[in-house]
Amino acid sequence: MSDSKQGNTIAREEVENLCRINGEPTWLKDNRLAGWEAYLQCPMPTGKTEDWRTTIVDTLDLSELTAVEPIAKATKEITLELLTSAKANLGDLAGVYVEDYATGSKSHNVDKALTDKGVVFAPLKTALEQHSDVLKGLITTERAGLKDKFTLMNQALWTDGLYLRVPKNTTIDLPFVFMVNLPVKAKEAAVKAEGSKDSEAEKFGQAVFPKVILVAEENSKVNFVTMIGSQESAQAEGQITLANAAIELHLAAGANVSVAEVSNMGEEVFLVNRIKAFIGKDATLDYTTAGLGAKQIKADIETILTAPGATARVNGVVLGDSDEHFAYNTIADHTATDTNSNIVFRVALKDESTSIYQGIIKVEKIAQRTDSYQSNKNLLLGTEARADSIPKLEILADDVKC
């Protein structure tokens, strides 16, 4: 793919118009444009790139994707099959926020008793208006971790998403739920054929850029469920929908956060999902991910254990069929003494589906007495199915258990 095509995907005017439509502060515009500048300079990954091994990205023509505009229509409640199923299993909820790009509507509900206690569960766009200074620090601060063309694309073009903040010493037993329902048909744009004065309709795939920021303050406890799904549509045949998502978790000292993430999409969806968690002193993150369907899922789950007593437990379940492809990359980065991580992935594949799991345990020189474990087991239920496992260790300390 040519650089010119990649550049056409994000024009500077597109980023500036997004800021103008949303009425965003100058600092956010500067941050978006910085992401756009870096995006143009960053090479496109290929199937030979280490973190993208076996993922088919070479044929993804970014110039044929159009970013979906922010959802403006608010409604009281949205009924979706995936959401209804989740509610049946979860029971009562602390709050629900749904972005339905298929209908161009969104729905937000939260227990008022929680907001009275200082809990923030709000669309990211709304939160920017009410908590601009706090979000500025979270969004603009440069942090360690993976950064490539897709993370920079999300930085420049994220349209909405969720901000969840739990005050210190607050325990919330009921779960919060955030769901994104992807567009189901290609977008038509009027273009002029070369040498003709008439316009013709050209179909483009669509791109969605959700962003989640979760902050758990000292000694708080919260349960969070995030789902991304889509419905099949004949109108979408042959047109890829790109979902480029980012989830950022901040756990202060003593915080306890449980996250369940479900991805269940149609065969025309390519999901790139980046999860990054910063885990403080004596804080615990339980993260469960379920990859249940898509054309391709490329997910990176990065846990950075920043202080003694930090614990990260990551569990993954992948169920593949047809010609679906799943690529999961976990990174447990131990940067302090006395930290613990436990990563377990289970994969079952039918038909011609494929998966690759890459697990990296990093132990910095200072991170003595690290206790870390990772396991990936695969069940192949079809003669054409294939699963690869690539565990890695990068250990600089000498008193560890891995």
Describe these PLM feature segments.
Residues N109, T115-C402:
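Conserved beta-strand/loop scaffold segments within soluble protein domains that form the structured core
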Residues S2-L152, V344-K350:
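N-terminal amphipathic, basic helical "cap/leader" segment at the start of enzyme domains
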